[in-house]
Protein backbone atom coordinates (compact mmCIF):
# COMPACT_ATOMS: atom_id res chain seq x y z
CA UNK A 1 0.00 0.00 0.00
CA UNK A 2 -0.96 2.67 -0.88
CA UNK A 3 -2.87 1.83 -4.04
CA UNK A 4 -1.70 4.92 -5.90
CA UNK A 5 1.61 3.15 -6.39
CA UNK A 6 -0.14 1.13 -9.10
CA UNK A 7 -1.89 4.01 -10.89
CA UNK A 8 -1.89 3.38 -14.63
CA UNK A 9 -3.91 3.62 -17.84
CA UNK A 10 -6.84 1.78 -16.24
CA UNK A 11 -7.51 4.64 -13.81
CA UNK A 12 -7.06 7.23 -16.56
CA UNK A 13 -9.60 5.48 -18.78
CA UNK A 14 -12.26 5.26 -16.08
CA UNK A 15 -11.87 8.95 -15.22
CA UNK A 16 -11.88 9.85 -18.94
CA UNK A 17 -15.21 8.05 -19.32
CA UNK A 18 -16.76 10.42 -16.79
CA UNK A 19 -15.15 13.49 -18.34
CA UNK A 20 -16.47 12.49 -21.75
CA UNK A 21 -20.12 12.74 -20.72
CA UNK A 22 -19.32 15.48 -18.22
CA UNK A 23 -21.75 14.53 -15.45
CA UNK A 24 -20.22 13.76 -12.06
CA UNK A 25 -23.39 13.30 -9.96
CA UNK A 26 -23.98 9.69 -8.93
CA UNK A 27 -27.79 9.71 -9.20
CA UNK A 28 -30.32 10.19 -12.02
CA UNK A 29 -29.80 12.14 -15.28
CA UNK A 30 -29.80 8.87 -17.22
CA UNK A 31 -30.02 10.59 -20.61
CA UNK A 32 -26.65 12.31 -20.10
CA UNK A 33 -24.60 9.25 -19.12
CA UNK A 34 -24.60 6.89 -22.07
CA UNK A 35 -25.17 4.13 -19.49
CA UNK A 36 -22.01 4.96 -17.54
CA UNK A 37 -22.47 4.56 -13.79
CA UNK A 38 -19.10 4.38 -12.04
CA UNK A 39 -20.49 4.47 -8.50
CA UNK A 40 -22.99 1.70 -9.19
CA UNK A 41 -20.32 -0.36 -10.93
CA UNK A 42 -17.95 -0.06 -7.98
CA UNK A 43 -20.71 -0.92 -5.51
CA UNK A 44 -21.63 -4.01 -7.52
CA UNK A 45 -18.00 -5.09 -7.74
CA UNK A 46 -17.57 -4.60 -3.98
CA UNK A 47 -20.55 -6.87 -3.38
CA UNK A 48 -19.08 -9.51 -5.66
CA UNK A 49 -15.56 -9.38 -4.24
CA UNK A 50 -16.64 -9.27 -0.60
CA UNK A 51 -19.54 -11.71 -1.05
CA UNK A 52 -21.91 -9.27 0.63
CA UNK A 53 -25.47 -8.30 -0.24
CA UNK A 54 -25.19 -4.51 -0.13
CA UNK A 55 -22.47 -1.89 -0.65
CA UNK A 56 -22.94 1.87 -0.59
CA UNK A 57 -20.17 4.30 -1.54
CA UNK A 58 -19.66 7.54 0.37
CA UNK A 59 -17.39 10.56 0.36
CA UNK A 60 -14.93 9.23 2.96
CA UNK A 61 -14.26 6.50 5.47
CA UNK A 62 -15.33 8.89 8.22
CA UNK A 63 -18.63 9.47 6.43
CA UNK A 64 -19.01 5.69 6.19
CA UNK A 65 -18.49 5.29 9.94
CA UNK A 66 -21.05 7.92 10.90
CA UNK A 67 -23.52 6.65 8.31
CA UNK A 68 -23.11 3.05 9.49
CA UNK A 69 -23.78 4.03 13.09
CA UNK A 70 -26.88 6.03 12.28
CA UNK A 71 -28.11 3.35 9.88
CA UNK A 72 -27.72 0.69 12.57
CA UNK A 73 -29.72 2.73 15.07
CA UNK A 74 -26.81 3.97 17.17
CA UNK A 75 -27.56 7.45 18.46
CA UNK A 76 -28.15 9.77 21.39
CA UNK A 77 -26.73 8.45 24.64
CA UNK A 78 -25.81 5.01 23.33
CA UNK A 79 -22.45 3.72 24.49
CA UNK A 80 -20.12 2.44 21.78
CA UNK A 81 -17.00 0.49 22.74
CA UNK A 82 -13.93 1.60 20.80
CA UNK A 83 -10.16 0.94 21.03
CA UNK A 84 -7.62 3.53 22.14
CA UNK A 85 -5.46 2.58 19.13
CA UNK A 86 -7.24 3.68 15.97
CA UNK A 87 -7.44 6.64 13.64
CA UNK A 88 -9.22 9.44 15.47
CA UNK A 89 -12.17 9.30 13.03
CA UNK A 90 -13.36 6.07 14.67
CA UNK A 91 -14.03 8.09 17.82
CA UNK A 92 -15.17 11.35 16.22
CA UNK A 93 -17.90 9.51 14.30
CA UNK A 94 -19.33 8.23 17.58
CA UNK A 95 -19.49 11.74 19.02
CA UNK A 96 -21.10 13.10 15.86
CA UNK A 97 -23.79 10.41 16.04
CA UNK A 98 -24.64 11.71 19.51
CA UNK A 99 -23.33 8.53 21.11
CA UNK A 100 -20.75 7.99 23.85
CA UNK A 101 -17.32 6.47 23.13
CA UNK A 102 -16.20 3.96 25.76
CA UNK A 103 -12.54 3.00 25.51
CA UNK A 104 -11.54 -0.62 26.12
CA UNK A 105 -8.18 -2.38 26.22
CA UNK A 106 -6.52 -3.95 23.20
CA UNK A 107 -4.35 -7.07 23.11
CA UNK A 108 -1.42 -8.10 20.92
CA UNK A 109 -3.70 -8.37 17.89
CA UNK A 110 -3.57 -4.53 18.18
CA UNK A 111 -7.38 -4.68 18.20
CA UNK A 112 -9.96 -4.72 20.98
CA UNK A 113 -9.52 -7.69 23.29
CA UNK A 114 -12.51 -9.82 24.33
CA UNK A 115 -11.58 -9.29 27.99
CA UNK A 116 -11.29 -5.55 27.48
CA UNK A 117 -14.73 -5.41 25.89
CA UNK A 118 -16.39 -7.42 28.66
CA UNK A 119 -14.86 -5.17 31.31
CA UNK A 120 -16.63 -2.01 30.07
CA UNK A 121 -20.08 -3.28 29.04
CA UNK A 122 -22.95 -1.52 30.84
CA UNK A 123 -26.75 -1.48 30.40
CA UNK A 124 -26.24 1.48 28.04
CA UNK A 125 -23.82 -0.32 25.71
CA UNK A 126 -25.31 -0.47 22.22
CA UNK A 127 -22.44 -1.39 19.94
CA UNK A 128 -18.81 -2.31 19.46
CA UNK A 129 -16.79 -0.36 16.92
CA UNK A 130 -14.26 -3.09 16.16
CA UNK A 131 -11.31 -1.57 14.33
CA UNK A 132 -9.14 -3.93 12.27
CA UNK A 133 -5.96 -1.91 12.68
CA UNK A 134 -3.02 -2.03 10.29
CA UNK A 135 -4.61 -4.56 7.95
CA UNK A 136 -5.35 -7.45 10.28
CA UNK A 137 -8.15 -8.73 12.46
CA UNK A 138 -9.27 -9.07 16.05
CA UNK A 139 -10.31 -12.30 17.77
CA UNK A 140 -13.54 -12.49 15.82
CA UNK A 141 -15.11 -15.64 17.24
CA UNK A 142 -14.84 -14.46 20.84
CA UNK A 143 -16.03 -10.95 20.04
CA UNK A 144 -18.99 -12.16 18.00
CA UNK A 145 -19.98 -14.35 20.94
CA UNK A 146 -19.87 -11.32 23.25
CA UNK A 147 -22.12 -9.38 20.87
CA UNK A 148 -24.60 -12.24 20.78
CA UNK A 149 -24.54 -12.61 24.57
CA UNK A 150 -25.22 -8.91 25.18
CA UNK A 151 -27.30 -8.19 22.06
CA UNK A 152 -24.80 -5.63 20.73
CA UNK A 153 -24.38 -4.23 17.24
CA UNK A 154 -21.02 -5.26 15.77
CA UNK A 155 -19.66 -2.53 13.51
CA UNK A 156 -16.44 -3.48 11.74
CA UNK A 157 -14.19 -0.53 11.01
CA UNK A 158 -12.19 -2.18 8.24
CA UNK A 159 -10.97 1.13 6.84
CA UNK A 160 -7.37 -0.12 7.03
CA UNK A 161 -8.12 -3.74 6.18
CA UNK A 162 -9.84 -4.10 2.82
CA UNK A 163 -8.69 -7.33 1.21
CA UNK A 164 -8.25 -9.03 4.57
CA UNK A 165 -10.37 -11.94 5.73
CA UNK A 166 -11.09 -14.19 8.70
CA UNK A 167 -11.64 -17.89 8.03
CA UNK A 168 -12.43 -17.06 4.43
CA UNK A 169 -14.91 -14.28 5.14
CA UNK A 170 -14.01 -10.72 4.13
CA UNK A 171 -13.25 -8.33 6.98
CA UNK A 172 -16.13 -5.88 7.14
CA UNK A 173 -18.75 -8.53 6.37
CA UNK A 174 -18.59 -10.54 9.60
CA UNK A 175 -20.52 -8.14 11.84
CA UNK A 176 -23.80 -6.31 11.30
CA UNK A 177 -22.22 -3.59 9.18
CA UNK A 178 -18.73 -2.76 7.97
CA UNK A 179 -16.84 0.25 6.67
CA UNK A 180 -13.97 0.82 4.25
CA UNK A 181 -11.90 3.91 3.50
CA UNK A 182 -10.50 4.79 0.10
CA UNK A 183 -8.50 7.90 0.92
CA UNK A 184 -5.22 8.76 -0.75
CA UNK A 185 -3.02 6.43 1.32
CA UNK A 186 -5.26 3.38 1.70
CA UNK A 187 -4.85 -0.05 0.08
CA UNK A 188 -7.03 1.16 -2.78
CA UNK A 189 -7.95 4.79 -3.30
CA UNK A 190 -10.70 6.94 -4.77
CA UNK A 191 -8.68 10.04 -3.87
CA UNK A 192 -11.31 10.43 -1.16
CA UNK A 193 -14.03 7.89 -0.53
CA UNK A 194 -15.49 5.21 1.69
CA UNK A 195 -18.10 2.47 1.75
CA UNK A 196 -20.69 0.88 4.01
CA UNK A 197 -21.20 -2.85 3.44
CA UNK A 198 -23.84 -5.07 5.01
CA UNK A 199 -26.09 -8.07 4.54
CA UNK A 200 -28.84 -6.27 6.44
CA UNK A 201 -31.28 -4.62 4.01
CA UNK A 202 -32.73 -2.29 6.65
CA UNK A 203 -29.27 -0.96 7.50
CA UNK A 204 -28.49 -0.54 3.80
CA UNK A 205 -31.72 1.37 3.14
CA UNK A 206 -31.04 3.65 6.10
CA UNK A 207 -27.47 4.20 4.89
CA UNK A 208 -28.25 5.23 1.32
CA UNK A 209 -31.04 7.54 2.52
CA UNK A 210 -29.15 9.09 5.45
CA UNK A 211 -26.11 9.85 3.27
CA UNK A 212 -28.25 11.78 0.74
CA UNK A 213 -30.51 14.04 2.83
CA UNK A 214 -33.05 11.25 3.29
CA UNK A 215 -33.78 10.66 -0.41
CA UNK A 216 -35.39 7.25 -0.91
CA UNK A 217 -33.99 6.96 -4.46
CA UNK A 218 -37.22 5.51 -5.82
CA UNK A 219 -38.00 6.45 -9.42
CA UNK A 220 -36.07 8.56 -11.92
CA UNK A 221 -37.24 12.04 -10.90
CA UNK A 222 -35.01 13.17 -8.04
CA UNK A 223 -37.22 16.15 -7.27
CA UNK A 224 -40.21 13.86 -6.77
CA UNK A 225 -38.49 11.45 -4.38
CA UNK A 226 -39.76 11.04 -0.85
CA UNK A 227 -37.74 11.81 2.30
CA UNK A 228 -38.61 9.12 4.88
CA UNK A 229 -35.79 10.24 7.19
CA UNK A 230 -33.45 13.15 7.77
CA UNK A 231 -29.85 12.92 6.66
CA UNK A 232 -26.71 14.66 5.47
CA UNK A 233 -24.74 14.84 2.24
CA UNK A 234 -22.04 12.18 2.22
CA UNK A 235 -22.36 11.43 -1.50
CA UNK A 236 -19.34 10.35 -3.51
CA UNK A 237 -18.81 11.78 -6.99
CA UNK A 238 -18.55 9.77 -10.18
CA UNK A 239 -14.97 11.02 -10.64
CA UNK A 240 -13.89 9.53 -7.32
CA UNK A 241 -15.79 6.32 -7.96
CA UNK A 242 -14.22 5.99 -11.41
CA UNK A 243 -10.76 6.05 -9.87
CA UNK A 244 -11.83 3.60 -7.17
CA UNK A 245 -13.41 1.22 -9.66
CA UNK A 246 -10.11 0.78 -11.50
CA UNK A 247 -8.30 0.35 -8.19
CA UNK A 248 -10.79 -2.22 -6.89
CA UNK A 249 -10.14 -4.37 -9.95
CA UNK A 250 -6.48 -4.41 -8.84
CA UNK A 251 -7.19 -5.35 -5.22
CA UNK A 252 -6.20 -9.01 -5.51
CA UNK A 253 -2.93 -8.04 -7.17
CA UNK A 254 -2.23 -5.45 -4.48
CA UNK A 255 -2.83 -7.94 -1.66
CA UNK A 256 -0.62 -10.56 -3.34
CA UNK A 257 2.25 -8.08 -3.66
CA UNK A 258 1.87 -6.90 -0.07
CA UNK A 259 1.92 -10.46 1.23
CA UNK A 260 5.02 -11.35 -0.77
CA UNK A 261 6.91 -8.24 0.34
CA UNK A 262 5.84 -8.57 3.96
CA UNK A 263 6.87 -12.22 4.12
CA UNK A 264 10.36 -11.43 2.85
CA UNK A 265 10.93 -8.82 5.55
CA UNK A 266 9.23 -10.74 8.34
CA UNK A 267 11.24 -13.88 7.59
CA UNK A 268 14.44 -11.86 7.80
CA UNK A 269 13.45 -10.13 11.05
CA UNK A 270 12.41 -13.40 12.69
CA UNK A 271 16.08 -14.13 13.38
CA UNK A 272 16.45 -10.99 15.51
CA UNK A 273 16.16 -12.30 19.11
CA UNK A 274 14.49 -9.26 20.65
CA UNK A 275 11.75 -9.03 18.00
CA UNK A 276 8.29 -10.55 18.39
CA UNK A 277 5.38 -10.04 16.03
CA UNK A 278 1.81 -8.94 16.33
CA UNK A 279 -0.68 -11.73 16.96
CA UNK A 280 -2.78 -12.47 13.87
CA UNK A 281 -5.77 -14.77 14.58
CA UNK A 282 -5.92 -15.91 10.94
CA UNK A 283 -2.53 -15.37 9.25
CA UNK A 284 -3.90 -16.40 5.86
CA UNK A 285 -6.37 -13.52 6.03
CA UNK A 286 -3.82 -10.80 6.79
CA UNK A 287 -4.01 -8.05 4.15
CA UNK A 288 -0.31 -7.41 4.85
CA UNK A 289 -0.40 -3.63 4.59
CA UNK A 290 1.87 -3.37 7.63
CA UNK A 291 4.42 -5.48 9.46
CA UNK A 292 3.90 -4.78 13.18
CA UNK A 293 6.52 -5.96 15.64
CA UNK A 294 7.22 -5.57 19.34
CA UNK A 295 10.40 -5.07 21.36
CA UNK A 296 11.05 -5.87 25.03
CA UNK A 297 10.87 -2.34 26.45
CA UNK A 298 9.58 1.13 25.65
CA UNK A 299 13.10 2.55 25.78
CA UNK A 300 14.43 0.01 23.29
CA UNK A 301 11.47 0.62 20.99
CA UNK A 302 12.12 4.37 20.97
CA UNK A 303 15.79 3.70 20.26
CA UNK A 304 15.09 1.33 17.36
CA UNK A 305 12.50 3.70 15.92
CA UNK A 306 15.17 6.39 15.64
CA UNK A 307 17.82 4.00 14.33
CA UNK A 308 15.54 2.66 11.61
CA UNK A 309 14.96 6.20 10.37
CA UNK A 310 18.67 7.00 10.56
CA UNK A 311 19.45 3.94 8.45
CA UNK A 312 17.01 4.86 5.70
CA UNK A 313 14.23 2.46 6.69
CA UNK A 314 11.26 4.72 6.02
CA UNK A 315 7.57 4.16 6.70
CA UNK A 316 8.03 2.91 10.28
CA UNK A 317 5.39 4.19 12.68
CA UNK A 318 5.81 4.40 16.44
CA UNK A 319 2.11 4.89 17.14
CA UNK A 320 2.53 5.50 20.86
CA UNK A 321 3.63 9.08 20.18
CA UNK A 322 1.55 9.58 17.03
CA UNK A 323 -0.89 12.51 17.23
CA UNK A 324 -3.64 10.84 15.22
CA UNK A 325 -3.70 7.18 16.21
CA UNK A 326 -3.41 6.83 19.98
CA UNK A 327 -5.67 8.03 22.79
CA UNK A 328 -3.03 9.53 25.05
CA UNK A 329 -2.17 12.12 22.39
CA UNK A 330 -5.77 13.21 21.69
CA UNK A 331 -6.07 16.25 23.93
CA UNK A 332 -8.93 17.60 21.82
CA UNK A 333 -10.87 14.37 22.40
CA UNK A 334 -10.06 14.25 26.10
CA UNK A 335 -11.26 17.84 26.53
CA UNK A 336 -14.23 17.53 24.10
CA UNK A 337 -13.00 20.45 22.03
CA UNK A 338 -15.19 21.36 19.06
CA UNK A 339 -16.44 24.58 17.42
CA UNK A 340 -19.71 24.17 19.35
CA UNK A 341 -20.97 22.06 22.23
CA UNK A 342 -21.24 18.35 21.38
CA UNK A 343 -24.37 16.32 22.24
CA UNK A 344 -22.39 14.37 24.83
CA UNK A 345 -22.04 17.52 26.95
CA UNK A 346 -25.77 17.21 27.75
CA UNK A 347 -25.09 13.91 29.53
CA UNK A 348 -24.39 14.66 33.19
CA UNK A 349 -22.64 11.38 33.98
CA UNK A 350 -20.56 11.22 30.81
CA UNK A 351 -17.04 9.76 31.05
CA UNK A 352 -14.20 12.04 32.05
CA UNK A 353 -11.97 11.43 29.06
CA UNK A 354 -9.03 13.18 30.73
CA UNK A 355 -8.95 10.32 33.25
CA UNK A 356 -9.20 7.32 30.92
CA UNK A 357 -6.63 4.64 31.82
CA UNK A 358 -5.68 1.79 29.48
CA UNK A 359 -2.48 0.36 31.02
CA UNK A 360 -2.53 -2.88 29.03
CA UNK A 361 -2.82 -0.96 25.78
CA UNK A 362 -0.05 1.42 26.85
CA UNK A 363 2.22 -1.54 27.61
CA UNK A 364 1.64 -2.94 24.13
CA UNK A 365 1.71 0.25 22.06
CA UNK A 366 4.79 1.66 23.79
CA UNK A 367 6.68 -1.39 22.48
CA UNK A 368 5.18 -1.59 18.97
CA UNK A 369 6.45 -0.36 15.61
CA UNK A 370 4.49 -0.82 12.39
CA UNK A 371 6.32 -0.89 9.07
CA UNK A 372 4.40 0.12 5.96
CA UNK A 373 4.63 -2.49 3.19
CA UNK A 374 4.97 -0.81 -0.19
CA UNK A 375 3.89 -2.16 -3.56
CA UNK A 376 6.62 -0.54 -5.62
CA UNK A 377 9.62 -2.18 -3.95
CA UNK A 378 11.88 -4.19 -6.23
CA UNK A 379 13.59 -7.35 -4.99
CA UNK A 380 16.81 -5.36 -4.76
CA UNK A 381 15.15 -2.66 -2.67
CA UNK A 382 13.70 -5.27 -0.31
CA UNK A 383 17.14 -6.85 0.09
CA UNK A 384 18.66 -3.43 0.81
CA UNK A 385 15.89 -2.68 3.30
CA UNK A 386 16.55 -5.93 5.14
CA UNK A 387 20.25 -5.10 5.41
CA UNK A 388 19.44 -1.64 6.75
CA UNK A 389 17.06 -3.11 9.31
CA UNK A 390 19.77 -5.46 10.53
CA UNK A 391 22.21 -2.55 10.75
CA UNK A 392 19.77 -0.59 12.90
CA UNK A 393 19.45 -3.47 15.36
CA UNK A 394 23.19 -4.14 15.42
CA UNK A 395 24.23 -0.58 16.28
UniProtKB/Swiss-Prot annotation:
Reactions mediated catalytically:
8-amino-3,8-dideoxy-alpha-D-manno-octulosonate + 2-oxoglutarate = 3,8-dideoxy-8-oxo-alpha-D-manno-octulosonate + L-glutamate
InterPro entries, sorted: DegT/StrS_aminotransferase, PyrdxlP-dep_Trfase, PyrdxlP-dep_Trfase_major, PyrdxlP-dep_Trfase_small
Which processes are annotated in GO (biological process)? lipopolysaccharide biosynthetic process; polysaccharide biosynthetic process
Residues with the modification N6-(pyridoxal phosphate)lysine, per the entry, are: 186
KW Transferase (keyword) present: yes
CDD domains reported in the protein's UniProt record: AHBA_syn
Q: What cofactor does this one take?
A: pyridoxal 5'-phosphate
**Which Enzyme Commission numbers does its entry carry?**
2.6.1.109
**What name does this protein carry?**
8-amino-3,8-dideoxy-alpha-D-manno-octulosonate transaminase
Species of provenance = Shewanella oneidensis (strain ATCC 700550 / JCM 31522 / CIP 106686 / LMG 19005 / NCIMB 14063 / MR-1)
Name of the encoding gene: kdnA
Amino acid sequence: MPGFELFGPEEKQEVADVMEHGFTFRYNFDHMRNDRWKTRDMEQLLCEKMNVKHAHLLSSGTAALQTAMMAAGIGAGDEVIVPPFTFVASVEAIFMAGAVPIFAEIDETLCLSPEGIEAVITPRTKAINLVHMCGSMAKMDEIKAICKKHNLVLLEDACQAIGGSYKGQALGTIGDVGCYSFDSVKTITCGEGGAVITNNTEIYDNAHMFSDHGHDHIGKDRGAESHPIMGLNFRISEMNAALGLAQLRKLDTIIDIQRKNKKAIKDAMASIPEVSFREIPDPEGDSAGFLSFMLPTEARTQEISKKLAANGVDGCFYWYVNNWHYLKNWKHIQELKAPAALPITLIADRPDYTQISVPKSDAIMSRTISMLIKLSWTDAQIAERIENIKKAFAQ
